[in-house]
Amino acid sequence: MANLSGLSNRSRTTLASLRRFGFQTTQQAKPTESSKTPIDASVAENWSIRPELLSLFQETLQTELGAQVRIRPRPRILALSHGRNTNTVSADGFDFHFGVRAQVNPVAAPIRDLHDAFNPDGLLESLTAAFDTSPYPIRAVVLTYPGNPLGQCCSAEALRRCAKFCHDRELHLICDEVYALSYFGAADSEATPFQSIVSFDLNAMGCDLSRVHVVWSMSKDFGCSGLRLGCVISQANPELILGLRVPTSTEVSSLSTLCSTALLTSATLPDIIELNVKRLLLSYKAVIATLECHGVEYIPATAGLCVFARLAPEAKTPDDEIGFQHRLRDSGLLRASSISYNSMVKGSSDKIRPNNVRQKKMEPTLKILGASLQEALSQLTGPLNKERLAALHDHSEGRLVDANLGEAAAYTIDLLHQVEQLLEPSSLVLADHFLGYLNTKCLCAAVEFHIPDLLVEGPKSVSQLAQLSGARADRLGQVLRLLRNNGIFQYDTENATYSNNPTSSMLRSDHWTQWHNWVDLYGNEFYDMARGIPASLKQGTTRTPAQINFNTDQCMFDYFTAQGWLPRLHRTLGGGATAQAPGILADYPWEDFGDGPFLDIGGGEGALIALILRRHTRTKAALLDTPRVIEHARTLFLSPDGKLSRYGDLTMMVSADGQERTEAEWRTLAGRTGWEIRTIRKLRGAWPSDETSYINYIKPLILAHELEIPHVLSVIDTKDEWFYRIHPERMVPSLKDQDPETKAEVIVFESTACLQYLADRFDDGTWTGRNAAERGSVLSWTAYQTAALGLHENCLRQWDILEKRLARDGQEYIALKDRPTIADLSYFPFSMPWMFQFLGVDIKDWPSIERWSQRMLARPAVQAVMEMGPQIGH
């Protein structure tokens, strides 16, 4: 036993109290850090508004901390006598601080019903029993509300009766109101609202005001436990206030004083309090939704930071509870055990009434999702807003999206889109698709009236924008309202003004991506051309949708040239390539090249090369394109005096005619320039030339062999200018025929159109359908391949859909069960076995497709075309 003779009686009492709580005088071993990062739910810490408070405190300390800061503390100290009564459930921390610091003996007044902790009758019954049976003289009642962990508020009647109880027995009533501003139950009409004891007219009740006190601190409502600053409110006991204030005047730091003063006098204090309540409610909803989803019983709360729940219903003893606590800790979760609260020691947890937990799990799941999304939204528009804008929405030239955040954002967006598809009513899904045209036309109107350009100098009202643009104010307001609801433009409700956001800024006429050209061209002429799609589907129609819309037989290249639209088309396509370059740079490990050179074939104006060279300054690169493109690109890389511009170290430019498709041709062309190609990287969306350069033109060739149609196969240079007359983008396949009646020339391009034309001319219905039902199925699946699924980028999704279709009983082919049709030819090239290999997947994961592809490959016409296809043009 240590020698205590040198200690005062007070110190001896304090030491004995500490030992009672397990503290030892021996030196403790240095604590070891856990290798895990646990979720710590064991401490009542309020983190909901910590980012806002941290910002406020940092600014305060930078501007206000100096040598002359005065300290006027109002400490939260309870210097009680030798006994006090406390209502429970209460945290074990109360026992420690009252016993060690104030050296009083707490007497618990157990709560009989945890669901109705502050029932006036039950509360008074418990207080009376504790007072009458206490082995110590009672001097005060400490009432904590809203309480930890129940999160319930005292009713007005309970507070009045408690005050009267104390007055009749000459006791002090100490109301712990540290959660006073954390009441979030206002939306619940049946919830008991928070009322402070100081809001009552206690004199009218005949109570002694000098014996009623309120304790409050910064620790809970504002999550500032580290400031160690609080206050005691005693309206009629100046002697008590003096006794508390003077002895503790040196115990409050200047930092705590500065931060607390800044917060409590801030003009934003009401907003911070409101935000705190809002976020606490969201967190509470998320917690109880999870509990309900798993059938866990809990006590509904309306205030504070805790939810009291029966996580281990099988636990009957303290040892059971401790064992469960250890299992949670091993799993990475720390939480306060029920034995940390006085009531649990007395078995009060057995009186938790089961909630009516719904058997249906969808509602709590949606609550969890909603609360999580609301919290994410608050973070993304609040403390994370600056990082979000910098990482994902900085579209200045050469600026790249953060690769990791971009990937995470894309994954999240995909999930949200899937959730939207699952939850959105079908009528709204159709409305969204149907009204998409309206959204596009509103966007076109904003570009046409130069609204993004007019907002460059700052926010403007609708009337100001209307005056500057020449638009009608009322209709312009309708257009802008629709656009800002879709994330384009930013609106200040207080000042009723619009301003550019990162999205609308990209529509400025001087923006390097030239998005305004895309909107203008595709949102007007291309959308107008789309109106011809229904008419183009009719059998016997030879005009394309664009020709139908413009009522012309000219190819679109000739028509665009005649209308003077071709320069704008080139600017649009060039701007699009430039806009895509940052994404390509972010997606691929260009640093693997080190200081070696690479060749960008068909690189246009060199946007990709420019970005790569700026990011990786030791890398060298070459641009391979037509002479006219090279001459234009040269001006972008070289300054007038011949020095390299800011775009980087471009060591060589070469040009070549013709359309290079195979790796062998790439190596030949590079060899002529003195380069040696050591590595060829395939970009996302690019396809292996030797196996897939013929992927489209084999479709009509197979049908021609199946129908035994006499034909002449011509191999042409698609880069030649004359080919614009055949195809507006100089692509293959295209076919030329003669009308059997008028002898007029017939030109058809695009593989699906070629299939349909050949079938219309030479098929008896075998490949297109012999009756209405068959024709409908063939037409639908053929159109779906090109219109809905796309060509390259959606292969995996396409295969999943085909697998589901072909897995049906007796469904040996796509459109019809018993025979192939042009629908099978439409899908077949993209479902060849080597396509699966190219994308790094196993065709055996799609067994129905594998069986179907083998049936198609076994057809003589398919074998004949597949044998000749790779050699065409090589």
UniProtKB/Swiss-Prot annotation:
Q: Which GO terms describe its biological process?
A: methylation; secondary metabolite biosynthetic process
Identify the InterPro entries for this entry: Aminotransferase_I/II_large (IPR004839), COMT-like (IPR016461), Glutathione-S-Trfase_C-like (IPR010987), Glutathione-S-Trfase_C_sf (IPR036282), Glutathione_S-Trfase_N (IPR004045), O_MeTrfase_dom (IPR001077), Plant_O-MeTrfase_dimerisation (IPR012967), PyrdxlP-dep_Trfase (IPR015424)
Q: List the disulfide bonds.
A: none
Q: What happens when the gene is disrupted?
A: Impairs the production of acetylaranotin and accumulates chemically stable intermediates or shunt products such as 2-imino-3-phenyl-propionic acid amide.
Q: Which UniProt keywords apply?
A: Methyltransferase, Multifunctional enzyme, S-adenosyl-L-methionine, Transferase
Q: Where is this region: Glutathione S-transferase ataG?
A: 669-874
Answer yes or no on keyword Cell inner membrane. no
What is the name attached to this protein's record? Trimodular acetylaranotin synthesis protein ataIMG
